[in-house]
């Protein structure tokens, strides 16, 4: 796994987490 790939995946995961957290 490339560091860049991990960074991008982490960012997407963080966004997904925020969306899920905002959902009731």
Curated annotation (Swiss-Prot):
rRNA-binding found in the keyword field = yes
- Could you say what the effect of mutating residue 16 to E is? Abolishes Trp-dependent ribosome stalling, prevents expression of TnaA and TnaB
What is the native source organism of this protein? Escherichia coli (strain K12)
On assembly, the entry states: In the presence of L-Trp stalls in the ribosomal exit tunnel near the constriction formed by ribosomal proteins uL4 and uL22, where it binds L-Trp, 23S rRNA, and probably contacts uL4 and uL22.
For this UniProt record, give its keywords in alphabetical order, as a comma-separated list.
Leader peptide, RNA-binding, rRNA-binding, Tryptophan catabolism
Pfam families of this UniProt entry? Tna_leader
Q: Which InterPro entries match?
A: Trp_operon_leader_peptide (IPR012620)
Q: Where are the transmembrane segments?
A: none
Q: Which GO terms describe its biological process?
A: L-tryptophan catabolic process; positive regulation of L-tryptophan metabolic process; transcriptional attenuation by ribosome
Superkingdom assignment? Bacteria
According to its UniProt entry, the function of this protein is described as: Required for tryptophan-regulated expression of the tna operon. In the presence of high levels of L-Trp release of this nascent peptide by release factor 2 (RF2, prfB) is inhibited. The ribosome stalls with Pro-24 in the P site and a UGA stop codon in the A site. This prevents transcription termination factor Rho binding, and thus allows transcription and translation of downstream TnaA and TnaB.
Where L-tryptophan binds, per the record, is at: 12
Query: What is an example of a GO molecular function annotated in this UniProt entry?
Result: rRNA binding
Q: Does the keyword Thylakoid apply?
A: no
The protein here is known as Tryptophanase operon leader peptide
């Amino acid at each position: 796994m490339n560091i860049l790939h991990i960074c991008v995946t982490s960012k997407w995961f963080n966004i997904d987490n925020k969306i899920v957290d905002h959902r009731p």
